[in-house]
Amino acid sequence: MKTFTAKPETVKRDWYVVDANGKTLGRLATELARRLRGKHKAEYTPHVDTGDYIIVLNADKVAVTGNKRTDKIYYHHTGHIGGIKQATFEEMIARRPERVIEIAVKGMLPKGPLGRAMFRKLKVYAGTEHNHAAQQPQVLDI
């Protein structure tokens, strides 16, 4: 019996909507990354993007455990000398709450062109509204 390999043009991708209200950031991000990769499917193939599209709502209400709300620090560099910037979890949630989930999930996906293609299927919104109603997303309880 030959090993099954999924073809990119035959992969069926579904749309799911997830409510992040009260969910722990890391536990939510691991499940999102697993579904974006397609590892929950029987036809999973490592070198083919077999994952689903995922819409995350209420990103501003995601939870973290312990003192991470004030102690967790996100760093980025502007590219200029001495241009390292930092922001705490609270500041990130206040400024751009979508980025918190995006950063967590992106770190759990493969690095390279395939990982970037998987990441593009993640749509994160701070509120309860999204503009993907035409795709008829199913509610996914994580």
UniProtKB/Swiss-Prot annotation:
InterPro entries: Ribosomal_uL13, Ribosomal_uL13_bac-type, Ribosomal_uL13_CS, Ribosomal_uL13_sf. One of its GO terms (biological process) is negative regulation of translation. One of its GO terms (molecular function) is mRNA binding. One of its GO terms (cellular component) is cytosolic large ribosomal subunit. The keyword Ribosomal protein applies. Pfam families: Ribosomal_L13. The keyword Ribosomal protein applies. CDD domains: Ribosomal_L13. Keywords: Ribonucleoprotein, Ribosomal protein. It comes from the Bacteria. Transmembrane segments: none annotated. NCBIfam families: rplM_bact. This protein is one of the early assembly proteins of the 50S ribosomal subunit, although it is not seen to bind rRNA by itself. It is important during the early stages of 50S assembly. Part of the 50S ribosomal subunit. Belongs to the universal ribosomal protein uL13 family. This is Large ribosomal subunit protein uL13. It comes from Pectobacterium atrosepticum (strain SCRI 1043 / ATCC BAA-672) (Erwinia carotovora subsp. atroseptica). The lineage of its organism: Bacteria, Pseudomonadati, Pseudomonadota, Gammaproteobacteria, Enterobacterales. The gene is rplM.
